[in-house]
C-alpha cells in the first residue's frame, strides 16, 4: 500500500470544521453559496474552503509532504439566508501563511479564483472579508489619507466639490482645459478626467496634462484657493502609467487618477507607492465594478472591492450616491463608506457588514458621490455623506443653462448653504428644499440651476439589498 487512499474526495471530512476557533491572524470570508440541487450546504461550504486554499479534486500523495492542518482553509460556520431558498452564508477562515505579504493580487487569486467556476455550486458571491491587522500591516495603503489631503488643500469642515468634464470623449486638449478652468474658477475644488479618457487620437495625454495644469494655476491665482484636476494616468502598460504620473508630478499637479479594476491591483499598488513617495494624491475610479458586484448571488460585493482598494492604495474612490442615477442602497452604501473612512468598524449585519474590521493605522479613503446628482440633491448628500466626502457633479455643473462657471457657482453656493444650515442645527433631510430655495434668492446662478433640475429624478428600486 502507498499509505493513502486514492480517489475523489469528500471535502466535508477535511474542510468543514464547525468547532474551529478563529485566530486573530486568520483572514475570514463570508460567501453567499448557492449549491447545485442535491449538494448539502456543508459539502458546498467545505468545497469553497478547499478550492480556495489547499484542496484539489482528488487525493494526491504529496499531501503527505505538508501540514494540511496548518495551511488549509476551513469552513467553520454555515447559516441559511432568510427568505432565500437553498442559499447559505458559508464562513471560511484562511491561515495567514497562504498569502503573499502586501499583495491584493495574490489574496484575490486564492479567495476569488478558480473556486467561482466550481461545478458543485450554482453560484457563489463573496459578501465580506475580515482583513487582520497582521496582514493589513504589510500594505502601505492610501498614499496620504483624509487628514493629510485636507492639510495639503487647506480645506476643512465641508465636503469637497468636483466635476467630471463632459462630453467625456471628443474634446480637444485646449477646449478641455478651458472647461477645467471655468469649473475651478467658479468655485469647485476639483475637476476630473472621465475614466475613459486615457490617450486617444483626439486628445493625447501629454497635451491634456499641459492644458489642465495651466487651468489649475490660472484658477488658483484668481481665487486664492488650492485647486486640482484628476489627471488620469491609466495606460496600457505599467511603465506608461508611471511615465504619465512622473509628468504630472513635474507639472506640479496635486492629484492624479487611476481606474483600479481595469488597470489591475498590481498596477494600482505600484502607482500608490509612487504617489506617496512623490506627494501626489490618488483618485480612484471603479469602472468595471458592476460587472463583478451587481449580481446578487454571484461575484463579489463592492464592500470587498473597497477594502481591497484601501489595502492597495487610493485617496478617493467612487462609492455610489444613494440619490443619483447609479446603484446604491443607503444603509449598505454607508456601511462600506465607513469601511473606507474609519479606523474601526463594528460588525453590523443590517448594513451588510459581516465582520468587525480593525484597520489600525491604515489611512482612510474619501468616498466620492458621483452620477446623476444636481443642486437639489445637495442637502441629502451633505447629510448622508458628511464632511469627509467628495461630491461630484458632471452634468450637474456643465449642464447649467449659463455655462460651466455659473454651474460651479451654483453648486458651491448650494453646498455652503447646506453646511451652514447643518452647523446651525437645522434638519437637512426635512428642510433641504427650503434651504436651497432660500439660498437661490441671493444667487442668480443657483436660481437658474434650481429651475433646470427641479423635476429630475432617477427613481428605480435598488438592486443591492440585503
From Swiss-Prot:
GO terms for biological process: photorespiration; reductive pentose-phosphate cycle. Pfam families: RuBisCO_large (PF00016), RuBisCO_large_N (PF02788). Binds 1 Mg(2+) ion per subunit. The record marks 325 as: Transition state stabilizer. One of its GO terms (cellular component) is chloroplast. It is found in: Plastid, Chloroplast. The modification N6-carboxylysine is found at residue 192. Mg(2+) binds at residues 192, 194-195. The active site is at residues 166, 285. CDD domains: RuBisCO_large_I. It is an enzyme of class 4 (lyase). One of its GO terms (molecular function) is ribulose-bisphosphate carboxylase activity. Its cofactor is Mg(2+). The keyword Lipid metabolism does not apply. The disulfide bond which can form in the large chain dimeric partners within the hexadecamer appears to be associated with oxidative stress and protein turnover. RuBisCO catalyzes two reactions: the carboxylation of D-ribulose 1,5-bisphosphate, the primary event in carbon dioxide fixation, as well as the oxidative fragmentation of the pentose substrate in the photorespiration process. Both reactions occur simultaneously and in competition at the same active site. PANTHER family: RIBULOSE BISPHOSPHATE CARBOXYLASE (PTHR42704), RIBULOSE BISPHOSPHATE CARBOXYLASE LARGE CHAIN (PTHR42704:SF16). The basic functional RuBisCO is composed of a large chain homodimer in a 'head-to-tail' conformation. In form I RuBisCO this homodimer is arranged in a barrel-like tetramer with the small subunits forming a tetrameric 'cap' on each end of the 'barrel'. Belongs to the RuBisCO large chain family. Type I subfamily. This is Ribulose bisphosphate carboxylase large chain. It comes from Moringa oleifera (Horseradish tree). The gene is rbcL.
Amino acid at each position: 500500500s502507498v499509505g493513502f487512499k486514492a480517489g475523489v474526495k469528500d471535502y466535508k471530512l477535511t474542510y468543514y470544521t464547525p468547532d474551529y476557533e478563529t485566530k486573530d491572524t486568520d483572514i475570514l470570508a463570508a460567501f453567499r453559496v448557492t449549491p447545485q440541487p442535491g449538494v448539502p450546504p456543508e459539502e458546498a461550504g467545505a468545497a469553497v474552503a478547499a478550492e480556495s486554499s489547499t484542496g484539489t479534486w482528488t487525493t494526491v500523495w504529496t499531501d503527505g509532504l505538508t501540514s494540511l492542518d496548518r495551511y488549509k482553509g476551513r469552513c467553520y460556520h454555515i447559516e441559511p439566508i432568510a427568505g432565500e431558498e437553498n442559499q447559505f452564508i458559508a464562513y471560511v477562515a484562511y491561515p495567514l501563511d497562504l498569502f503573499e505579504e502586501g499583495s491584493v493580487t495574490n489574496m484575490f487569486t486564492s479567495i476569488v479564483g478558480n473556486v467561482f467556476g466550481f461545478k458543485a455550486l450554482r453560484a457563489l458571491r463573496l459578501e465580506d472579508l475580515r482583513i487582520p491587522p497582521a496582514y493589513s500591516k504589510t500594505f502601505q495603503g492610501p498614499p496620504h489619507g483624509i487628514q493629510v489631503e485636507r492639510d495639503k488643500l487647506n480645506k476643512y469642515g465641508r465636503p469637497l466639490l468636483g466635476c467630471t468634464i463632459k462630453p467625456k470623449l471628443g474634446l480637444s486638449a485646449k477646449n478641455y482645459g478651458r472647461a477645467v478652468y471655468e469649473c475651478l474658477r467658479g468655485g469647485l475644488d476639483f475637476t476630473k478626467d472621465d475614466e475613459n479618457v486615457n490617450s486617444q487620437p483626439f486628445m493625447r495625454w501629454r497635451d491634456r496634462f499641459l492644458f489642465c495644469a495651466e487651468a489649475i494655476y490660472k484658477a488658483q491665482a484668481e481665487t486664492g484657493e488650492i485647486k486640482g484636476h484628476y489627471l488620469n494616468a491609466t495606460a496600457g502598460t505599467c511603465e506608461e502609467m508611471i511615465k504619465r504620473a512622473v509628468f504630472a508630478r513635474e507639472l506640479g499637479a496635486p492629484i492624479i487618477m487611476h481606474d483600479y479594476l481595469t488597470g489591475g491591483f498590481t498596477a494600482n499598488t505600484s502607482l500608490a507607492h509612487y504617489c506617496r513617495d512623490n506627494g501626489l494624491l490618488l483618485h480612484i475610479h471603479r469602472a468595471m465594478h458592476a460587472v463583478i458586484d451587481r449580481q446578487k448571488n454571484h461575484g463579489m460585493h463592492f464592500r470587498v472591492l473597497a477594502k481591497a482598494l484601501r489595502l492597495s492604495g487610493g485617496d478617493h474612490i467612487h462609492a455610489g450616491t444613494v440619490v443619483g442615477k447609479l446603484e446604491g442602497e443607503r444603509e449598505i452604501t454607508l456601511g462600506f463608506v465607513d469601511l473606507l473612512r474609519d479606523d474601526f468598524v463594528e460588525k453590523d449585519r443590517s448594513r451588510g457588514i459581516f465582520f468587525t474590521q480593525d484597520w489600525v493605522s491604515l489611512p482612510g479613503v474619501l468616498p466620492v458621490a458621483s452620477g446623476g446628482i444636481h443642486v437639489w440633491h445637495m442637502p441629502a448628500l451633505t447629510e448622508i455623506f458628511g464632511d469627509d466626502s467628495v461630491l461630484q457633479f458632471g452634468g450637474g455643473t456643465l449642464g447649467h443653462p449659463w455655462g460651466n462657471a455659473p454651474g460651479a457657482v451654483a453648486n458651491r453656493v448650494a453646498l455652503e448653504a447646506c453646511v451652514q444650515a447643518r452647523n446651525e442645527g437645522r434638519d437637512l433631510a426635512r428642510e433641504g428644499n427650503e434651504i436651497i430655495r432660500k439660498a437661490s434668492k441671493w444667487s442668480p446662478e443657483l436660481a437658474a440651476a434650481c429651475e433646470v433640475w427641479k423635476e429630475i429624478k432617477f427613481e428605480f428600486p435598488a438592486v443591492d439589498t440585503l
